[in-house]
């Protein structure tokens, strides 16, 4: 009887915890964050970029694959406008250049964001700190990367917000600093434009309550430790996507596009850098998310 009872309790506790997380996200997530049309509470992503492309085809052949799982867990304050948000994730890159052995690089990260609104003001601020373990084999010897961002938002109208800020991270190749500029724009009932450049920018169009399509740009700069130093990826992706809602919250995302100005480099910090000079290729992305939309579908 005991062996039967324990698994039932564990399954029930897991379901209750999941429902609590969803309830907190739906009911209490800060209003200032709702300028973006949705929040992905849990996301699974897989991207495959084969050695086939239309741009820069005369460089070294390369294949890339990517997998990640992540979540967003807000802890709101009493005013329901301010919050601390925990966004832990795991990711892995696989890369193979020409006929060399395939290499894998991993990341375990914990971004923590503090969202603060100012009473009777159109201004708000987001402060972010992120700790990451990036390596070809994560262990006790893996060096921790620490970085963060400051993002100031100005709500010009009910449907339009501008954002400015700066991002800093202690990458394995050195200190990486990047200015930020963003927008959250509800163009009309069917169209949205949102993102923070140079990281990402998304255009979204609603067909009906089950289907949305649009265009995406994202830029990725990360470094991972290895036996001799570091492996660095600079990946820029421009693509088209389709979101299919199976019900109110479960979403399948399909995206296809092309990389632009892709670079894979290795090196030793402040000493040497080697550029693999790889091709830009097509990419195909599949994602499954539990999504909360802040506007009526």
Describe these PLM feature segments:
Residues 67-73, 108-114, 148-150, 181, ...:
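Membrane-embedded beta-strands of outer-membrane beta-barrel proteins
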Residues 42-50, 86-92, 127-131, 164-168, ...:
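Transmembrane beta-barrel strands of outer-membrane/channel proteins
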Residues 61-67, 102-108, 140-146, 175-179, ...:
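Residues that define the transmembrane beta-barrel architecture of outer-membrane proteins
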Residues 49-55, 91-99, 117, 130-138, ...:
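Sequence/structural signature of outer-membrane beta-barrel proteins
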Residues 180-186, 242, 277-297:
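Outer-membrane beta-barrel "beta-signal"
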Residues 35-96:
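Short glycine/proline- and aromatic-enriched beta-strand/turn motifs that initiate or cap beta-hairpins
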Residues 73-75, 116-118, 154, 185, ...:
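Residue-level signature of outer-membrane beta-barrel architecture
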Residues 77-84, 120-125, 158-164, 190-193, ...:
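Repeated loop/turn-to-beta-strand initiation elements of outer-membrane beta-barrel proteins
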């Amino acid at each position: 009887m005991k062996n039967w009872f324990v698994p039932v309790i564990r399954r029930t506790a897991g379901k209750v915890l999941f429902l609590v997380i969803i309830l907190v996200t739906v009911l209490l997530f800060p209003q200032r964050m709702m300028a973006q049309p949705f929040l992905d509470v849990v996301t699974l992503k897989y991207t495959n970029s084969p050695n086939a492309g239309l741009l820069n085809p005369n460089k070294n052949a390369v294949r890339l694959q990517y997998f990640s799982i992540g979540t967003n867990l807000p802890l709101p304050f009493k005013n329901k406008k301010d919050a601390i948000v925990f966004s832990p994730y795991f990711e892995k890159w696989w890369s193979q250049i020409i006929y060399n052995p395939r290499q894998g690089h991993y990341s375990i990260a914990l971004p923590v964001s503090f969202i603060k609104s100012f009473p009777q003001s159109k201004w708000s601020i987001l402060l972010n700190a992120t700790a990451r373990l990036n390596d070809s084999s994560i262990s006790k010897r893996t060096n921790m990367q620490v970085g963060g961002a400051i993002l100031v938002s100005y709500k010009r109208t009910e449907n339009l917000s501008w954002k400015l800020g700066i991002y800093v991270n202690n990458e394995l190749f050195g200190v990486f600093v990047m200015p930020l500029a963003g927008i959250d724009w509800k163009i009309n009932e069917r169209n949205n434009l949102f993102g923070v450049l140079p990281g990402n920018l998304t255009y979204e169009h609603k067909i009906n309550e089950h289907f949305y399509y649009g265009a995406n740009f994202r830029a990725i700069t990360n470094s991972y430790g290895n036996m001799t130093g570091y492996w660095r990826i600079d990946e820029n992706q421009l693509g088209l996507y389709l979101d299919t809602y199976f019900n109110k919250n479960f979403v399948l995302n399909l995206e296809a596009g092309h990389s632009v100005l892709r670079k894979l480099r290795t090196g030793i910090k402040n000493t040497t850098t080697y550029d693999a000079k790889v091709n830009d290729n097509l990419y195909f992305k599949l994602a499954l998310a539990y999504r909360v939309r802040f506007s009526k579908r």
